[in-house]
């Protein structure tokens, strides 16, 4: 998941084994992750290595983790790990990887062949679309096309990018 660091939000939700919402309190840890080629977990999903611990705190389900926590972090790949205790006193944990970016970044926040942030892509006639497109690759040629709702191409352009973002 990608989040802009100025507006990033996280709310922890807990469920029982029967998938019923429950309340919980616990701790969270945020780690920065390595940009190296990831390993695969047992389900085949990418699993990035932890680079270092960057912050810790506490949470109560249903309440936001302070947005200031995310604003203070530089653009990059992170893992949020939450821990709590269930009704039987057993420790439970979950984690979620995410990417923080800043709209003013000159290049993608992590190595990516295709970096796309949709800011405003469904528009009324005369309204401007806004998105950020980038690549970590060097000397790339990108063909972009803009279509109307009835599939008519209104613009086609070839642009060159080299480890950069464009708005």
Language-model segments: residues:
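C-terminal segments of large proteins
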Residues: 1-167
